[in-house]
Amino acid sequence: MKVTEYIEKANGSSLISLEILPPLKGKGIGALWNHLDPLMECKPAFINVTYHRSESMFKRKADGTFDKVEVRKRPGTVGICAAIMNRYKVDAVAHLICGGFTKQETEDALIDLNFLGINNVLVLRGDAPKNEAFFEPEPGGHKYAIELLQQVTNMNNGIYLEEDLKNAVKSNFCIGVAGYPEKHFEAPNMHSDILYLKAKVDAGAEYVVTQMFFDNQKYFNFVQACKEAGIEVPIIPGLKPISTKKQLNVIPRTFHADIPEALSNEIMKCKTDEEVEVVGTEWMLQQSRELKAAGVPVLHYYTLGKPNMVCNVVKQLM
């Protein structure tokens, strides 16, 4: 079932969804089940599986010189989506990114997803490679998320890269995109960022999932601004638990999300990571309760290695 169909069927009730990372290369499927098994108590409507571009590494050759090689540390998104749907009978949402993929590779991935009956995708530009300041597309790939989105909508209309294909099968993907309650860090201002989001919705995006935030008012303001811009698709809030003091610096730097002073003050008082987890869980619980009371369509949790914290919150919401 499509994400939008789940939302429509819920008839105003807030659903639960989860987001996971693929296991590192070399890890077996058991690593995924160990992460997901406890999370299934949350009764998620769907589970997002991230996609990551390859990273450049230098490997020493026998003569002492180095070769630059591209290594994908977390492969397997398409296979993991299929495995999740087979084991748990829960729909999976495959992330698609521009970075590191050609248009042909993207089309091949979409064909695989379509064959497997995975009908939900989240299209993203993706980040710049590590140690590089700016995003550069793969030769023959997409530079912007809206271009990737248009490729998916083309396939939904039976239009493939090989234009001479006759009577090509139409795919049936439900397409989500990302939204930024604190604006995308590359956008000059919030207004221009929302206009770009509106362009993606006009191009076929059916729902929005936000970047993590820790101040609900920023989400409410974002939703209102989107409505004023004519964006009428569901806007799903993304939530993440803080579990270590280190994240007070890592999250703003990596995800460009502010951490409220009240939250950071409480975390700084903690002497152990266990104490931080208690504070982080309570904060996310209060966020979740307020958002649920406001009638958000879905509460989307970035689990990122902390399934127990998410489970604790969801159990108290049930």
Spans of model-derived segments:
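Flexible, glycine-rich active-site loops centered on histidine and acidic residues
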Residues: 103-150
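Conserved, mostly hydrophobic/aromatic
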Residues: 19, 47, 113, 200, ...
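Active-site mouth loops of central-metabolism enzymes
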Residues: 15-33, 91-104, 174-192, 268-282
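Conserved N-terminal beta1-alpha1 strand-loop-helix module at the mouth
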Residues: 1-49
